[in-house]
Amino acid sequence: MSHVAKVGVLYSTEGPYASIGRDCWDGAHLGIAHARTQAAPSVDLQLVSADPRADLSRYLSEAQALLRDHGCRHIIGTITSAARKEIIPLVEKHDALLWYVCPYEGFEANESVIYTGPCPNQHLLPMLDYVMPRFGHRAYLIGANYVWGWETNRLARQLLHESNGEVTGERYLPMDETDVDRVIADIRTKVPDFILNNLVGPSSHAFLQAYHELGRQDPRFHPSSRPVVSCNLTECELGAIGSGIAEGNLSVASYFASLGTPENRSFRSAIAAELGPDRSPSAFLATTYATARLVAEAITLTGTDDPVVIRSFVTSHPFETILGRLAIDHRTNHASLPAHVGRISLKDTFDIVMSHPPVVADPYLAHPQGQGAIRPGQDRHLRIVS
């Protein structure tokens, strides 16, 4: 008789971050579906999905249903830090594991969470490392008015200060706010070297559209001179911004669809076969896919979905994934991840301009790399592509 292992999926496919949620949803479902074809007959992998519709209170009730009513011992889910923090106490209460795939602001390490998304030394630091020597040390910070925006900009402010940089301005907007005229006017007045964009969803789209228009009116603000740089912008949002609108701006991620590896070509073919030839996988889709495969493989190889056993297994056995060799540190439950900086092309893809080999996560920036990685002139073994 086969052992039934239920894995919960908890993503919003509606609301201000719907495009991210859809990519995560699809990545989880495809990852489990592909894993089931290779699972041992003794393991019956079952997926139980819930959509909180971007309602914070529903995250809690849906997570409760997955854990208590359906008997899931693993949940792949949540996008925002607010949602993650909302359900962690419930996950702890049920002795379960939450698998979190999104970039976040760091300063967290919980034994009930496996973090396969990047923390600041895997996204913000590599981005500043690339941008500051090329464009300058004067930054304008704009962010979503919640913990992701606050904390990421706080870290950026600290890192800029340590590198003799300057914050020329700092603004925060709700995720669904699209009136960015005052922010654009302030940027035009202060003329920063680059803009660090930590907005989410419609506010980010509106800002990039308005900045594109500013660049058309005033050549000083063309992205080739003063780019907008992001730590959470991927392929899944470029269509909503508008064709070619974000061209020349930069983002950092552990995966871009343009990666030229044989593994990525095979992955893209599989995605095209399942989701259509026009679907360009983002880091959200790829990371959720890799995470779902990791969960399924760990359950299959150990023969149990016991979270204690699975956590011990995944923190002691590296896995080959579409992101590369994924190793999870037993001290922090965070994955080592590559960092790629991509420049948005006219075709709404990312041209990779810098790649960093897998970086060990340092969620509390406790090691020298956390404060020294962005200082020009240090040997950091970066591979500059262009």
Language model features: what each stretch is:
Residues A5, I322-S386:
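Solvent-exposed, acidic/polar segments of extracytosolic/periplasmic ligand-binding ectodomains
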Residues D23-C24, Q38-G106:
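Beta-alpha junction/loop-to-helix N-cap segments that form part of ligand/metal-binding clefts
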Residues L67-I79, W99-V101, Y140-L141, V191-F207, ...:
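Periplasmic-binding protein-like
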Residues Y211-Y289:
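Extracellular/periplasmic periplasmic-binding protein-like sensory domains
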Residues Q38-A54, N110-S112, H161-E177:
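Short beta-strand elements in bilobed, periplasmic/extracellular small-molecule ligand-binding domains
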Residues G8-G27, A50-P52, S280-F284:
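Extracytoplasmic "Venus flytrap"
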Residues T116-R171:
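An alpha-beta-alpha
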Residues T300-S312:
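Short, charged, surface-exposed loops that flank catalytic or proteolytic processing sites
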